[in-house]
Regions:
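Claisen-condensing/thiolase-fold acyl-transfer catalytic domains that form or cleave C-C bonds
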Residues: 36-143
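Short, flexible, glycine/charge-rich loop motifs used to bind or transfer phosphoryl groups or to couple energy/partner
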Residues: 1-3, 26-28, 100, 127
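Short, small-residue-biased leader/transition segments that mark boundaries at the very start
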Residues: 1-13
Length: 143
């Protein structure tokens, strides 16, 4: 389990996802191609594009990156702007779609990277930073 917690007002969840995924690859020696699917939690379409840009800057291209906030809706037929958000979004996509897809043999190796922000109205009104978090869990099925 890789987890990074930051409390900087200028850090986006996409930045933390980048840091966590990089740490996972560095610590395990794995690459994006070692996974059938890499999924972030509720960055939405904008956050996903920011994350892809961060990796592109380092010369790393993903063909297997998805986001729960994008997967949970059909942006072509629903007016959802950037997609879903919140911890329920990631939980629903992981347990209702991704794990079932693994059971059906669609994917064998998954890197799931949940992201979030610990929002507090009091902290925000006091001008304090918004702590953000990202954790990565590698999930695989037996061969």
């Amino acid at each position: 389990l890789h987890q990074l917690i930051h409390s900087f007002p200028t850090r986006r969840s996409s930045d933390l996802a980048y840091d966590t995924i990089q740490a996972h690859f560095r610590d395990t020696g794995r690459r994006p191609s070692d996974y059938d699917l890499i999924v972030t939690g509720d960055l939405g379409s904008l956050g996903k594009e920011i994350l892809l840009d961060l990796f592109h800057r380092d010369g790393i291209e993903f063909k297997n990156l998805e986001d729960c906030g994008v997967l949970i809706y059909d942006a072509q037929t629903q007016d959802v702007h950037c997609g879903g958000s919140g911890c329920g979004c990631s939980a629903a996509v992981l347990t209702g779609f991704l794990l079932n897809g693994m059971k059906q043999g669609r994917w064998r190796r998954l890197l799931f990277c949940g992201t979030g922000a610990l929002l507090s109205p009091t902290s925000t009104l006091q001008g304090e930073s918004i702590p953000s978090i990202c954790h990565a869990v590698a999930i695989s099925t037996e061969q």
